[in-house]
Amino acid sequence: LTAAPQELLSVAAAPFQKMAAVVSGGVASLWEKYTSIDDVMAENETLKAENAELRQQMVDYDRVKAENQAYKALESIQSQRPEMSYLSSFVIGRDPLDSFYGFTLDRGTLDGVAVNDAVVSDQGYLLGMVVEAEPTSCKVMTILHPNFNAAGVVSRTRDNGIVTGSSEYAADGLCVLTNLARNTLTEKSDQVVTTGLGGVFPADLLVGVVQELVPEVSGKSTIAVIKPGTDPRTVRHAFIITSF
């Protein structure tokens, strides 16, 4: 029997209907995939933002934790010298070409920092002085630098001299106390502090201990080689004395 025209048309169209269904399904599936990719990308961006925020919170937490530890270390010193104002700061840069280990702190004139401010460690040992002050940062010349000068005294013998740096000892993290008498009574392990003479540095800032005594080249005086109480080469946090 000959099939009715409608049946023939239905049979002929069947492959095309199947193809259309496949294409339609493929497009729908592809659209779902693109939509899914967009959702995943949006979720990734959200996660990235959340991770960045968490990382910043951790950085802030670490900074506050470090500052709290530093202030605790300084409490006993600050209680003895309440007239001094200490500003917490972190080392944010070092010049690799500086043979005397100068560094940059993250505090500047906007925080009250000024050139010639003394810089001390968390334990109160003299590290150096501010030589350049920008609005949000400052550069520190360490006690290892030959251009650094602070009036110092051996606390036990009261022998006076000048605390300064030396190219001969800087690489070992040592500074010197010059102009001691040739027959000085100063000995190894004696403590050296500042005198306050000149008004740049407060009196009685800890510097370090005498490691050895060597005659000055002319033979007229003695140099005390000092091991600083805190090594300026590796310090990461410091206090700037903004007033005293």
Residue ranges and their predicted role:
Residues 1-28, 32, 39-42, 55, ...:
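A secondary-structure micro-motif
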